[in-house]
Amino acid sequence: MMSSIVSWWFFWVISAVCILKVEFNIVEGGAYEETKVHIVYLGEKEHNDPELVTSSHLRMLESLLGSKKDASESIVHSYRNGFSGFAAHLTDSQAEQISEHPDVVQVTPNTFYELQTTRTFDYLGLSHSTPKGLLHEAKMGEDIIIGVLDSGVWPESQSFNDKGLGPIPKRWKGMCVDGEDFDSKKHCNKKLIGARYYMDSLFRRNKTDSGIPDTEYMSARESLPHGTHVASTAGGSFVSNVSDNGFGVGTIRGGAPRARIAVYKVCWQRVDRTCASADIIKAMDDAIADGVDLITISIGRPNPVLTEVDVYNQISYGAFHAVAKGIPVLSAGGNFGPGAYTVQNIAPWIITVAATTLDRWYPTPLTLGNNVTLMARTPYKGNEIQGDLMFVYSPDEMTSAAKGKVVLTFTTGSEESQAGYVTKLFQVEAKSVIIAAKRNDVIKVSEGLPIIMVDYEHGSTIWKYLSITRMPTIKISSAIALNGRLVATKVADFSGRGPNSISPYVLKPDVAAPGVAIVAASTPESMGTEEGFAIQSGTSMSTPVVAGLVALLRAVHPDWSPAALKSALITTASTTDPYGEPIFSEGMTRKLADPFDFGGGLVNPNKAADPGLVYDISAEDYRLFLCASHYDEKQITKISKTHTPYRCPSPKPSMLDLNLPSITIPFLKEDVTLTRTVTNVGPVDSVYKLIVEPPLGVKISVTPNTLLFNSNVKILSYKVTVSTTHKSNSIYYFGSLTWTDGSHKVTIPLSVRTQMLMYFDQ
């Protein structure tokens, strides 16, 4: 997922570039047919012996290709730990042929994904200086193992120092793999306990054949700053007196600073950051076998989003098997917001994370000649600039008249197109460029190079002053730090939004966490900074924040299922910021945030540790959901590897009955009744009363309206009947359903849309 790179000149270009290693096979008639990597998915493994599983894969390939030699040369990965399958070089006709094998669930082409931070955890109530709370109850995540699938790691970073850590947990079965500029004995320690890299589905293990730049490392070491930032945000150690070029000065740490980190490099520097699905699945398979306690993946595909078990959505496949084995999987909600239907990683068994701002900002003061001071969004770090002010329409108009002046211009283009202003700036020797563009929460630090971004409102204010002033002037000062209540919390404009167009009954995203201007470890070479720490933004940054919290929750509640952990996060999340102020949603226009912006709300880790009740979900519940979603019974059988052919009940269950900690009804016409089940994880003898805030024009009836728990009754169900008073198609309206015993508030969001005319978009 997207990250904002701190240097003004470095713009990410996000695109789906499918770079395939190409070979050719001779087919009938002497023609050549291209081979490329395909993933053959076989579902749950039949053997606990990994070698037997791999042998079965080779036998299947041998029967297809005709020889052991061809099978051995064709296979790329054998998935043999968490589930069964393999990746191999096949022609399209060979892929079609093997797909007809009775043991094969699906054959899919190798597809490609994209990559999507000091005050963060204090803002969420996890100050290490406070002796009480989840952070200390969980012993800072001691011995929890966080698996990070990303672009690698910069192992020398102080965020991965192992000072004060005990021996590596005995349950750890993973490894550190040597490679270019990566010595496992030197670079791994009691903090960074695992480091693997995966490239076989993309290219051979040498740079000559790979087409990657010399700056990339053929090892777990990363060349561009993403994976290091993600890993240190989730579980980085304490590091004092750090900053990004003077911003965010303080002590930095991850969410679970005493957790162990295992890195799986699956993304590579090509034309863009390329992450191949065959490698991602292999990394997830290894992570399951290695013994990680959770997996965080800040990776996703460009729109359109894909179904839970779509042939191109292999992350969901791998996540299903991890969750079935008790390993929670977190993934980024994507950076294609703020439009509707842009959220990614929408499978109900994944924890999908949105991004918010913090109560911290580094605005740059712009003082006009009339003594009006505006605060620009770009954090400028450099000497004060004073000069005459002029306006131009485009870079082409930035003539020699701009020499020595501060130039104002407006743009509707992308960040990439703004690079043209940088080039012209130096050609004509202007002092600075102020670019007015649509509001954007991606921060780029302008360090010594005066490229200042403002929104249209501030741009118009500057233009009005300029247009009525004979000799307009401006002063640009170095950025200042703003912290606390005065800085509003917002869902970032880039954060992927619901509703979920593929599975509309599943609310996504699930929760939100800070993902804007996050300071964490980075790669000093590419960041142009000796400190090795950087500000980045994106759902890639918010996801490891929540991963750190899940690590703490796992330490306190090792017996909770992934669904219970997810429920605790959602039902205790807040729709206000830590100061009690409303959370806004940033976009073309600003509004109050709703469940399609942030799911249950902003995570509240201390409350999540004691949620009172949880909505649990079993593997069988997910199978019933797949039945309700009209998946083929053979697919469900293979995915879960049941001993007998899986049969969906008749009639098929309702998708509304999946025991999610939310209720989303996208097509309400007649009354519907659904069921939810809660498990008491609080005081044994508890009485919970109901509070309902119905969506506008919607009636909610709940039976019973009181839940009584005791030593014999720990699990209770309730029914919810939903009806509409609307007479025509409506938009989505939102509400909430809360159970409270006086000390706990267990809240789930409600999202309801009336559809009197189906398939008619008003």
UniProtKB/Swiss-Prot annotation:
Residues 120-609 form the Peptidase S8 domain. GO terms for molecular function: serine-type endopeptidase activity. Its main location: secreted. Transmembrane segments: none annotated. Its EC number is 3.4.21.-. PROSITE patterns: SUBTILASE, SUBTILASE_HIS, SUBTILASE_SER. One of its GO terms (biological process) is proteolysis. Residues 1-16 form the signal peptide. It is found in: Secreted. The keyword S-adenosyl-L-methionine does not apply. The active site is at residues 150, 226, 540. It is an enzyme of class 3 (hydrolase). InterPro entries: Peptidase_S8/S53_dom, Peptidase_S8/S53_dom_sf, Peptidase_S8_His-AS, Peptidase_S8_Ser-AS, Peptidase_S8_subtilisin-rel, Peptidases_S8_3, S8pro/Inhibitor_I9, S8pro/Inhibitor_I9_sf. GO terms for cellular component: extracellular region. Glycans are attached at residues 206, 241, 371. Belongs to the peptidase S8 family. This is Subtilisin-like protease SBT3.11.
